[in-house]
A protein has these predicted regions:
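SDR active-site strand-loop-helix element
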Residues: 19, 43, 84-85, 119-125, ...
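Residues forming the Rossmann-fold NAD(P)(H) cofactor-binding site
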Residues: 26-27, 101, 140
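Conserved glycine-rich Rossmann-like NAD(P)H-binding loop of the short-chain dehydrogenase/reductase
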Residues: 38-47
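NAD(P)H-binding glycine-rich loop region in Rossmannoid oxidoreductase-like domains
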Residues: 48-106, 110-113, 125-129
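Conserved cofactor-binding/catalytic machinery of classical short-chain dehydrogenase/reductase
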Residues: 67, 103-106, 118, 141-142, ...
């Protein structure tokens, strides 16, 4: 089906339930939904995290996508659901399958019971039925839960997201800050298609006014396809640094990470992520413009936040912890 941008109809005024609304992408989605006149309700897992909202326009309900019994109160009178919860590494009592498959199934069931008319689901580019990559496989499983629900849906598969408070670009900034030679696993030629988190949030807000986007799965990227080497260079330029790269053999790093991830509670990178380095994380060029009618912002000139990363922050991230002042934006 050929999709083209259509004029926005202004305020939509729906009751929208957002999961993951206090997170990096979620805060931007909540803002985009409010700006378009929707009533926003957030499912909040950790009491207190709703403090990220400086306004009182957001209704808060406490619950967990892993606890179906906690969801019913949050979903009353909901007309649309935006499901954002996902993890990039397994945690205790929260495996990829727990969160991406079963958690999504629980949210879908609650949405269906509430009579929701649109389910907007953020997955990941590369999601597929290949069990070799647990992250991407469970993302695909989550998509199947949505598709099989009978609720009209829109699924987004974004490439890597950037924006203040992100993890990917901030970690690279930490490496640039700490190392005169920036370590790169493998050739660094693996491809990305960075998309601003603000722009994905805008796409989600626009979707609620678009009947033609129901039943669609959308791979989304920004204005430029880049290699990992290119991204490192762009981060270094944004920080006013000149850095050479030091390429580490993939097999050696795989063995090293296999040992350290058994020791560190939150390793900088996992063996699964190393194995996924060979997967191209790119979408069709111009997809955002064609479908949503606006040009996404480029990474260059829009990552000034990397200058907030200090040497101590870089060391902290190497040890597996994201500094609070970098993520709380």
């Amino acid at each position: 089906m050929q999709l083209t941008a259509v004029p926005a109809d202004g305020a939509i005024d729906l009751v929208v339930l957002v999961t993951g609304g206090t997170g990096f992408l979620g805060r931007r989605v909540v803002k985009a939904l409010l700006e378009r006149g929707n009533a926003v309700r957030c499912l909040v897992h950790s009491p207190g995290s709703e403090r990220v909202f400086s306004h009182r326009e957001v209704e808060v309900q406490y619950g967990s996508i892993q606890d179906p019994a906690s969801l019913s109160a949050a979903f009353y009178d909901v007309e649309a659901v935006v499901h954002l919860v996902g993890i990039i590494r397994p945690r205790r009592r929260a495996s990829f399958e727990d969160v991406h498959k079963q958690g999504t199934a629980n949210v879908v069931a609650a949405a269906k019971q509430a009579g929701a008319r649109h389910f907007l689901h953020v997955s990941a580019i590369g999601a597929a039925s290949d069990r070799s990559y647990p992250y991407l496989y469970t993302k695909w499983q989550g998509e199947q839960e949505v598709i099989d629900s009978g609720i009209p849906y829109t699924i987004y598969r974004p490439s890597v997201l950037f924006g203040e408070g992100d993890e990917f670009i901030n970690v690279l900034a930490g490496l640039v800050r700490v190392f005169p030679l920036v370590p790169v696993i493998g050739s660094g030629k693996n491809r990305y298609h960075p998309l601003a988190a603000d722009d994905l949030a805008k796409c989600i807000g626009i979707t609620l006014g678009r009947e033609d986007l129901k039943g669609q799965i959308l791979d989304l990227g920004g204005t430029e396809r880049m290699s990992y080497n290119d991204v490192v260079s762009q981060v270094a330029r944004a920080m006013g640094k000149r850095r050479l790269r030091f390429h580490l053999p993939t097999w050696l790093m795989y063995l090293a990470v296999k040992v350290t991830q058994g020791i560190m509670p939150r390793p900088l990178i996992t063996t699964d992520q190393i194995r996924m380095l060979g997967i191209r994380s790119v979408a069709e060029m111009g997809e955002v413009e064609r479908v949503f009618g606006f040009t996404p912002q480029p990474m260059e000139g829009n990552i000034g936040y990397v200058n907030s990363v200090g040497v101590a922050d870089g060391i902290q991230m190497l040890l597996g912890a994201m500094p609070r002042h970098l993520r709380d934006h």
